[in-house]
Amino acid sequence: MARSFAMPGDMDAASMKEQRPVLDELASANEDLTIDMSKVEFIDSSGVGALVFIYKRLLSSGFKLKLESLKGQPLQLLTYLRLTDIVAR
């Protein structure tokens, strides 16, 4: 079974602080996770860190993280960091 979550907006330090409880819950779910990134126009190191945190937690439990609808700056940054190689798209 897979769970879906739509990221509500940009993934910067301020928004990641607000989203932390939700992201902790998602990372603890015992199922694959798909994150819809269609509303994310900007991501900084806090957002990247949150995605890596979720990815590692899911991977350690045998589950996968998939990012959907990556575009613009988030796609460019995650591609540059080679995170799109480890996260299914």
Which residues does each PLM region occupy?
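Short beta-strand/loop segment at the start of cytosolic alpha/beta domains
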Residues: M1-A6, E18
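Amphipathic alpha-helical interaction surfaces in cytosolic regulatory modules
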Residues: A13-V87
